[in-house]
Every structure is written in structure tokens, then in C-alpha cells.
Amino acid sequence: EIGVRLVGSEMCIRDRYDYIADVFDTLIVRDIRKKYKIRNTQLMDRIVDFLMDNVSNLSSARNITNTLGSMQEKIHHTTVGNYMQYLCNAFAFYKVRRYDIKGKKYLSSNDKYYLSDHTFRYAKLGTKNMDYGRILENIVAIELLRRGYEVYVGILYKKEIDFVAVKRSEKIYIQVSDNISEEKTFEREVAPLLQIKDAYPKYCLLYTSPSPRDG
């Protein structure tokens, strides 16, 4: 289990998650509601759940509006965008923009949002149907930000490089994967890195689960 360690080891897992969820709701969400005088608290909660369930996925205020708007009364993408910005201002989530490596320009739509600590996700949404590849990507994003890098999602010839991390004259490219056991998967993950023509370091970070030794 990776994440914040806020409670004593004598507490059961469910109690820990209840405590962590309460910390998130009390210290972050409720403070945001009060600071920005948010009336539609249900919408805020739905946006939080959506972003938690879609860490490492491309998201925008419009596609979130379309998703949530189909479930309840009509909502406006400007309101959703404001609520997303409030969550980022409170450091609950971090927005990472897309960057066209060849064109050397930022792309104006579909950013990625990373959760400040994915233990909040466990606590509020549980572990069912969790994509560990996206969780690993979230961990890498937060660690890069913690180390002082400016972080972007790289786009090159319509292919994605998970991270372009820049700090002063330093630049690194990173692909993250939880499984490259199949050749097609390996080629898909590595191909974008091989197409980058500069001399900056390029890494592929993998999660490998331990396997029992034969015999």
C-alpha cells in the first residue's frame, strides 16, 4: 500500500480509509466550498469523484460537463471549469498541460489531472476496477512535481509521451507502463521516445510484480 500514512497501525484498513476520506472532505473540499461560496455542493462532489476516477486520463471542463450533465440537471462548462480550478488552487489536484514537441507549443484542450495523493482515491472510491497503470502514472507525476520539475504531457506525431519534465537546462522524457510483456505493448510504449531526435535522457518506467521462482 502506497500513500499517506496518517493513522496508527492499530486501526483497521476501513477505519484508516474513513479517516483519510474525512480529512480530504474536511480540509480540502469544505474549505473550497466556504472560500468560493459554492452553492452546488453536489456538483463539486461529482467533479471530485470524476477526477479521482480518471487520473492520468485526458479531461476537459466540456467533457466532464457532458458526462455529468447527462446524469442530472443541465450544468455549464464554465462552472465546471471554475470548480476544477478551485480544486487545483487547493492542491487537491495538479493540472498538466499537453505540449507539442515538434511544434514547440502548448495545446489548448484536454489536459491531465493528477491527484495530490492517490490514497484519497482509495479512501473515497475504493479499489474496484482500478487501473494500476494510471495510478503508477499519477505517482510519477506527483514525484516529478515534488522534485521541482515543470511537467507536461508530450505530443509527437499524434503519439503521447507521458511526461516531459523540465528544470532549468535539464529535460527528461518519461513513458510509464505497468505491463510491457507483450511485444506490441513494448513497441507502442517505446516508439514515441525513439522518435524524439534530441539528446536529452529518455526513460521507460515500469511496474513489475514479483513472480515466484521455479523450484
Predicted regions and their residues:
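Active-site donor-binding loop signature of nucleotide-sugar glycosyltransferases
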Residues: 118, 176-178
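Accessory nucleic acid-recognition modules appended to NTPase machines
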Residues: 17-168
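Alpha-helix C-cap/termination motif
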Residues: 5, 147, 166, 196-199, ...
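Structural motif
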Residues: 170-172
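Catalytic cores of nucleic-acid endonucleases
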Residues: 154, 178-209, 213
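Short secondary-structure boundary/capping segments
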Residues: 3, 104-105, 194
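Single conserved hydrophobic/aromatic residue that forms the stacking wall/gate
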Residues: 1-8, 13, 207-215
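Hydrophobic/aromatic beta-strand patches that form the interior of the parallel beta-sheet core
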Residues: 114, 174, 203-205
